[in-house]
Amino acid sequence: ALLLLFVDRLLRGLLQLPSWLGRNLARRRTDSGHRALALGLMAVSAGEPDEARRQAARAQRLLSAPHLTDLLSAQAAHLSGDHNAAARYFTSLTRDSDTAFLGHIGLARLALEKDDPGTALTAARTALDIRPKSALAARQVMILEAERGNWSAALPALSVVMRAGEQ
């Protein structure tokens, strides 16, 4: 009876081995992806574009979290001067309600760097529509509208900035 119990446990263990290995592999893959994401964010913060792009690519391979990896990839591309890639990633972020605000803010910044205030204003307005209390979006709208002399649109944005305690 003891031998039969031992054989039963051994067979059950062998049958469960593939699923255990699969879970372990998936967990390790996710852990490695989160590490790549963290290292990529640190590289962006440190101003290291090559490392940021390398870690962003690694995180995209390992994680099924396009919001996070697209944001990192957009920042890394922007940092390395690849505005076309950054625009693609920021545009991708605009397609999801959870990340649309960040996508539009990123597109506004890219447009400002390309000296395209019209596109920047459109993106900043969209960001402000998504988050009406955002001082960042309101500040961009306020400045761009003021530069156009459109005070009736700049003043409401100024109110948002002032309520947020920004100067």
Q: Could you describe each region identified by the protein language model?
A:
Residues R29-A65, L72, A76:
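Alpha-helical segment of the N-proximal tetratricopeptide repeat
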